[in-house]
């Protein structure tokens, strides 16, 4: 058809675009499995007791809210998520590209999020594209660790909670400060509550 129409197709470019799309699909799938792992760690594992205590007792959330927002817990293990994702068929490179793992100086691929409450970040259609992780250990120097730029996520282009606001057909948005503020507002009936993920917003 292209020949008949006199159109030249860039085969290399098409192959590159296909590889990029396949990588994005794999990163989204990797994030989805990671979210399941974090959620089960929070709601079912004994190790998740500290996370449940923080969310349910200290912050006053209900289990319904935990489920709705897909909250989770990253256990204080070095290889828990890495081993889980390997068992699910994901490669070390995919985990590192998704910013879920990193390679240590000794060459080991290790979990990036440890002993943290995990807030999955969704795109507008509900795909998990990133995470925010809040430290539970008060001595941890980094209170929050967030996913860096990946093939599926750029923090300045996304809003936390926007997928839920969009699904609720909210006709206006309320810009809140952080994850828990969005959860509290939306749970209280303010469906348009969202939070920025960077220091500035794009148009």
Give residue spans per PLM region.
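Non-catalytic interaction/clamp surfaces of large macromolecular machines
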Residues: 19-67
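Generic secondary-structure signature for well-ordered alpha-helical cores
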Residues: 3-6, 43
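Aromatic-rich juxtamembrane segments at the membrane interface
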Residues: 70-72
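Phosphate-handling DNA/RNA-contact segment within nucleic-acid enzymes
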Residues: 1-3, 16-34, 75-203
């Amino acid at each position: 058809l292209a020949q008949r129409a006199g159109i030249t197709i860039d085969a290399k470019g098409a192959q590159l675009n296909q590889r990029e799309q396949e990588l994005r699909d794999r990163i989204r799938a990797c994030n989805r499995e990671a979210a399941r792992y974090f959620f089960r760690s929070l709601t079912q594992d004994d190790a998740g007791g500290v996370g449940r205590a923080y969310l349910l007792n200290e912050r006053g959330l209900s289990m319904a809210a935990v489920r709705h927002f897909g909250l989770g817990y990253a256990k204080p293990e070095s290889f828990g998520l890495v081993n889980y994702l390997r068992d699910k068929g994901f490669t070390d490179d995919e985990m590192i590209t998704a910013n879920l793992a990193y390679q240590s100086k000794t060459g080991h691929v290790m979990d990036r999020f440890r002993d943290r409450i995990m807030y999955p970040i969704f795109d507008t259609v509900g795909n998990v594209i990133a995470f925010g992780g809040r430290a539970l250990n008060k001595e941890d120097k980094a209170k929050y660790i967030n996913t860096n730029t990946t093939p599926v996520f750029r923090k300045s282009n996304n809003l936390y909670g926007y997928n839920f606001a969009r699904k609720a057909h909210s006709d206006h948005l309320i810009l809140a400060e952080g994850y828990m503020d969005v959860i509290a507002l939306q749970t209280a009936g303010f469906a348009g509550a969202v939070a920025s993920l960077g220091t500035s917003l794009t148009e």
